[in-house]
Curated annotation (Swiss-Prot):
PROSITE patterns hit by this protein: RUVC (PS01321)
Protein name (Swiss-Prot/TrEMBL): Crossover junction endodeoxyribonuclease RuvC
Domain of life: Bacteria
GO cellular component, one term: Holliday junction resolvase complex
CDD domains: RuvC
GO terms of molecular function: crossover junction DNA endonuclease activity; DNA binding; magnesium ion binding
Chief location: cytoplasm
Binding-site residues for Mg(2+) 2, renumbered to this chain: E67
Biological process per Gene Ontology, one example term: DNA recombination
Organism: Pseudoalteromonas translucida (strain TAC 125)
Annotated SUPFAM superfamilies: Ribonuclease H-like
EC category: hydrolase
Length: 174
């Protein structure tokens, strides 16, 4: 079973979700949030890095998946989100994990089947896919959704590669 660490980055709260998958079967391993709210920004970045490092040591994931930056209404918010992502990605890079990035639309499409789904729909589907007894907190659910999205992306690439008989100009052809 492949273990995936999914991260929903944030400068005040960073969600994480860990799942194992084999084929279409998922196993929930853990989720939660790295709480950062009451610290100076540079300390929060350090806490993200340290939190990611601890999660990698605890769960030994084989891959790391993270949400891409979206353009917020406030440019300062987008910059802080980018820095939070950077701190998380460095944690993965220091552990030599491959890093995969997905947009919010890709994640929602993979988990809910609708790229415009809202947070409650994502939480509901994550709960159902992973057969959780309760609804996960929003940031943890988003991180689990990122991990599920990555698993689906891997499965689709494997199917595509298996169905291709040759390549033409670098593209797979049947």
């Amino acid at each position: 079973m492949a273990i995936i660490l999914g991260i929903d980055p944030g400068s005040r709260l960073t969600g994480y979700g860990v799942v194992a998958h084999q084929g279409s079967k998922f196993t929930y391993l853990g989720s939660g949030c790295i709480k950062l709210a009451d610290h100076e920004f540079h300390i929060r970045l350090k806490m993200i890095y340290q939190g990611i490092t601890q999660l990698i040591e605890q769960f030994s994931p084989e891959t790391f998946a993270i949400e891409k930056v979206f353009m917020a209404h406030n440019p300062d918010s987008a910059l802080k989100l980018g820095q939070a992502r950077g701190a998380a990605i460095v944690g993965a890079a220091m552990a030599d994990l491959p890093v995969f990035e997905y947009s919010a639309r890709q994640i929602k499409q993979a988990v809910v089947g609708n790229g415009g789904a809202d947070k409650t729909q994502v939480q509901h589907m994550v709960k159902n896919i992973l057969k959780l007894p309760g609804t996960p907190q929003a940031d943890a659910a988003d991180a689990l959704a990122i991990a599920i999205c990555h698993a689906h992306s891997e499965q689709n690439l494997i199917k595509l590669a298996g169905s291709a008989s040759k390549t033409v100009r670098g593209r797979l052809r049947k």
